[in-house]
Structures are given as C-alpha cells and as structure tokens.
C-alpha cells in the first residue's frame, strides 16, 4: 500500500513539474538555427523606416501620387494618394488576395458580392482572389492608402474596362473559370481600428490570413508591457522580411544594426529576414501596428531561454 501511494505521489509531482516547465517556456529544447555572419543589408526601395511626413514633403503639390515602399520576393506595398472624384477601374487579381489600410480621407469601395461601403482613417479592406472591385475617392480632400499584395501580383480587367498599357505586354481576351474567392478563415471585407478599439478588452486580431500573406493588428499600451529590457534583442524571421504600418500612436523598434527607431502613425518600418527586432508600444496613449509578412504562422526565432 505504501509503495503504491508513493508511486502515485511521484506521478502527481511529475505532472506538476511538467506543468511548471511548460509555463516557464523552458520545455522546448533549443535548436540550432542559421544566421548570416553579416547583418543583411537594406536593398532599395527598402529603408528601416519610411516617414509619412517625408513622403508628403516629397510629393507636395501633387493631388495624385504613389510610391513603392516594400518590394521584396514576398510582398509588394505602396502608398497611394488619390484626388477627390478619381476612381480605379474595375479589376481583379487572378491568384492573390489584396488588402489596404486607409490612412487619410474617404474611399467608397465596391467589392463583388458585398454592399458598397465607405472606408476612412483606420479602415482595413481586403479583396479575395478573382473578385472584382473598384475604389472611388470621395469627399473634398485627397485619400491616402497603403496597399499590399503578393510580390509580382497580376491584375486583370473585365471586358468593359480599358486596361493600361504595360511595356512588353499585350492584352488578350481570355477566360479562366473565374470564381470570386471567399471570406474564410476569419477574413472580413472591412474592419475599422477605431470601431474595434471601442471594446476596452480589444488588444488586436489577425485581419488577413492567406496562404502567402498575413496581416495582424497589434494594439495596446506600453504601460501593460513588462519593463523594457535593453538586453533582449527580440527575434528574427528566417524565411522572409517583415514590415509594419503604424496605425496609431508610436511604436519603438530596436533593429539589429540600426539602433532604436521610434515610428509614428503613417510610418512604415521594414526589417529584412535574419534581422533581430523587438517592437513594443511606446508612449502614454494607445498604439497600434499592422504587422505584414508572407507566412500565417511565421517562425519567431529568439535566443534560447530568453523572454521575447
């Protein structure tokens, strides 16, 4: 009887210890992970941070302008300003899902299968594969959006539209068994950050989940974070770069080889693959960043046994 009781006690202790190990985060055995000896370099058009204020100065006096911010082998992102009364042609992407964030102004969005809606500051909009859509700028001020798609994504147009000229290409009348994509996996046509933030418990959520791209709303307050640890260099991603659009407040970015960057609303921060970074909310008020990369479950590789 004594031996049986002892065995049961030891088994119970083993379960408790295992639970404590899992909570401490030390239950995962360390792995050898490759990392280049030299810190990856930034290749144009990429910069550690693209300031919205600088873009506005660069394009001052223009009602319509665009500038590519991200153009790597995973994603393509660009800022687009459009004047009131202008609109895109009706179009669709044959194999990719597109999304954009409205930074300023008002956009009337028409998406096949959805009721038209108006997107404003804080709005995030996405259009699934093979789904026809158009964007119209309304109101009395230009609208500014940050638009993202898969690298080298192609654009098709319905027959009633006149496609733009593309050097080296011709336009053919084609069919592709087009089927508008679904809003599955929790994807939605439109959300607005400020509507979401009316819930005091809101601290972010994935906005766009696709096989080859991912956009995550990360929202909160610096006061809710653990104390800043300058020795914690965060994590890196071994398969692709990552970028963020600051949607509200300020975000602090220690980036390997670049020092500390404080990014504000409208700024875009970019970190190449294999580069350590440790973003966190900064300042007294609420802050939000939209994290964008090419993998729905991207690996966050950190130094073993250090909190991230």
Predicted regions and their residues:
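N-terminal secretory signal peptides that target proteins for export/translocation
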Residues: 1-2
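Bacterial N-terminal signal peptides
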Residues: 6-16
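A short, N-terminal "cap"/entry segment at the start of jelly-roll beta-barrel domains
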Residues: 22-76, 89-90, 155-227, 233, ...
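Short histidine-centered beta-strand/loop micro-motifs
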Residues: 66-69, 79, 88-94, 111, ...
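Short, conserved secondary-structure segments in the cores of folded domains
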Residues: 78, 98, 115, 123, ...
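Short, conserved beta-strand element in jelly-roll/cupin
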Residues: 81-83, 93-109, 222-224, 236-253
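Short acidic-glycine-tyrosine-enriched beta hairpin
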Residues: 113-129, 257-273
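Ligand-binding loop in jelly-roll beta-barrel domains
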Residues: 123, 129-156, 273-300
């Amino acid at each position: 009887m004594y031996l049986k009781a002892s065995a049961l006690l030891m088994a119970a202790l083993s379960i408790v210890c295992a639970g404590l190990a899992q909570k401490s985060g030390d239950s995962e055995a360390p792995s050898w992970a490759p990392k280049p000896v030299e810190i990856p370099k930034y290749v144009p058009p990429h910069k550690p941070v693209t300031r919205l204020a600088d873009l506005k100065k660069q394009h001052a006096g223009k009602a319509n302008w665009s500038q590519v911010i991200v153009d790597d082998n995973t994603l393509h992102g660009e800022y687009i300003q459009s004047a009131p009364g202008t609109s895109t042609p009706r179009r669709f992407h044959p194999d990719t899902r597109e999304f954009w964030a409205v930074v300023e102004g008002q956009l009337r969005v028409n998406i096949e299968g959805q009721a038209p809606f108006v997107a404003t500051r804080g709005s995030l909009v996405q259009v699934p594969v093979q789904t026809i859509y158009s964007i119209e700028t309304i109101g009395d001020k230009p609208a500014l959006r940050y638009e993202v798609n898969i690298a080298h994504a192609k654009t098709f147009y319905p027959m009633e539209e006149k496609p733009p000229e593309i050097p080296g290409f011709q336009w053919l009348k084609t069919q592709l068994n087009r089927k508008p994509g679904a809003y599955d996996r929790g994807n939605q046509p439109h959300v607005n950050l400020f509507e979401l933030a009316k819930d005091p418990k809101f601290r972010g959520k994935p906005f766009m989940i696709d096989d080859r791209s991912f956009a995550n709303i990360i929202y909160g307050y610096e006061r809710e974070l653990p104390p800043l640890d300058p020795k914690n260099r965060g994590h890196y991603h071994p398969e692709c770069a990552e970028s963020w659009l600051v949607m509200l407040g300020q975000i602090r970015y220690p980036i390997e080889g670049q020092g500390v960057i404080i990014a504000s609303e409208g700024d875009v921060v970019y970190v190449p693959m294999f580069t350590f970074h440790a973003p966190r909310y900064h300042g007294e008020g609420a802050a939000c960043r939209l994290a964008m990369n090419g993998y729905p479950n991207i690996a966050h590789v950190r130094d073993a046994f250090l909190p991230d």
